[in-house]
Amino acid sequence: MTDAPPLVPASTVVLGRDGEDGVEVLMLRRNSKLAFGGMWVFPGGRVDEPDRRSGDREVEWARTAAVREAAEETGLVVEPSSMVAFSHWIPPEIAPRRFSTWFFLAPAPLGEVVVDMGEIHEHMWARPVDALGRRDAGEIELVPPTWVTLHWLSGFTTVDQAQRSVVEPEVYATRVGRLDETPVVMWGRDSAYESGRLRAGGPRHRLVMGDVWRYERSD
C-alpha cells in the first residue's frame, strides 16, 4: 500500500451577514481551469510560509492565511479577532491532494466584493438553504465540506447565533464508500467508519451523495 499524500495546512473563512430572511453567506466560483474548477466555495487557500510566523499552532497559521486569502479573492479585509474556528476538515487518505483545512466563520466586513478574475470568476450572496437547493437542481456544484457547512448554517437566523453555538471546532476526518453506485462520505461517529459496512445499523454521520444529497447524523 502506498503512503497517503501529506497533509497541507489550509484555511477557509465563511463570511456571513444577517439578511431579512436569515443568514446570507458569500460564495465564490472557482476558475474552471484550476483545481476544484467551477465549484462554488468560500474564500480560502493553503497556508503560505509567512503565515506560519503568526503562532505555534496550525489553527493560528490558518487564521492568518484566511485573512490574507479573503483580501486577495474578495477585496474584503476581515478582522482576525472576529473569526470563530468551527470545523477542521481532513480528506481521506486516498485523495491525491490532501488539505488539512480549518473553517472559520466571521461577520462580513463592509465594502464592495471585488473578485480577482484569476482564481475566482464570480461571486454571490446566498442563504444556505438556497445554495443547497441550487446544488440539488444542478445549477451549482459544491464539495462536501461546503455542503455540510451550508447545512449547519441553515439552522441559524444570525451570524452571531451561529458563532455562539460553537464550543470547539468539530473534526471531520473523512472516509469514503459506496452504496451501490452512490458515493458516501462518512466521519468518526458513523457505524461504518471502521468497518465500511454502510448498510449495517447503528449511529450515522455521513453524507449520501446521490442526485439529491442527504446528510445523516445521529448524535
Positions of predicted regions on the chain:
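N-terminal leader/linker segments that precede catalytic domains of diphosphate-processing enzymes
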Residues: 1-120, 125-219
